[in-house]
From Swiss-Prot:
Claim: DNA repair is one of the keywords in the record: no
Pathway: Lipid metabolism; fatty acid biosynthesis
Record-stated family: Belongs to the thiolase-like superfamily. FabH family.
A matching Pfam family: ACP_syn_III_C
GO biological process: fatty acid biosynthetic process; secondary metabolite biosynthetic process
Subunit and partners: Homodimer.
Top-rank taxon, per record: Bacteria
GO molecular function, one term: beta-ketoacyl-acyl-carrier-protein synthase III activity
Protein name in UniProt: Beta-ketoacyl-[acyl-carrier-protein] synthase III
Amino acid sequence: MTTPSGSRPSIGITALGTYVPPRVVTNKDFEAHMDTSDEWIVSRTGIRERRFAAENEFTSDLGVRAVQDLLARDPDGLRDVDVVICATATPDALFPSTAALIAGQVGLSGAGAFDLSTACSGFVYALSMAQGLILGGTARRVLVVGAETLSRLVDQHDRSTAILFGDGAGAAVVGPVPQGHGFQEFVLGADSAGGPSLYARCMADRLPGGILMGERVGMNGREVFKFAVRVLGDSGQQVLDKSGLTSADVDWVIPHQANIRIIEAANERFGVPMSKTVVNIDRYGNTSSASLPLALREAVDDGRIQDGQQLLLVAFGGGLSWGACTVKWWAGAPSLTAAQQAEVTA
């Protein structure tokens, strides 16, 4: 499915914030309880460490911290927000929605709030939904949160999944931006035939009496790799075509941070070099719906992404699902100095 642009108001990201828990889990930490090594993990995934939430820290808590980071950068960032969307595969509970819990903690009680579940594709889906709500007149601005506590969902003794995932959150306000900036095109898709290749059946519930039952994350790594390379490359090319762009027009690719081999192979497929690709999987692992905002925020803060540059966001996830979008970046979203960032995350 594609969403056409045509002649319409410019909508984009007006504020951005992120959060990762302070607990660092290195590859060496896994060596104590499973047959693996730092060299084996790095060579196959590109991951060196990831962050795990504390026992009393839930998905909504991470999301709230990401919004607080956003507000530290832009104290007026939540002005006119009418709807909150949380993209997550690890909600605090089946209901109330994690979005509603976050809204209540950041001064947005009364705003519309709902969760969106397309696993690692969730942030792209949520950005598209946010734009639609604004263009349709339902909202003036939308707060989009991608937050995950995947460390609780995986079997920490399963080498095929435990080494891959980390916890984190990103928050973005979507709203009107200057003409010539913002979102250009979206491509969204899903194919349930591949669902058995990557799934999670149930999870811990933060409410009293919550328990973990049945299987956790299941994955056919070989099938997921083939799917991911194909769909990232194809959806990336499709959204470029819809935008009237070529790979040469792209200043930065921000891919879902799942596996460095997948990122490299997908880039080769649509012709963008790794030198134009934002990668931080080595420090955070696969944070699912949080991976895109974490990578985007980092590249804005360190000066790689500049006003007016052409961005390509691509993601895939369970479902199996995929999403891609083209964005002309607006630098009105404030960034923090290193000292300010340290104060926010302390």
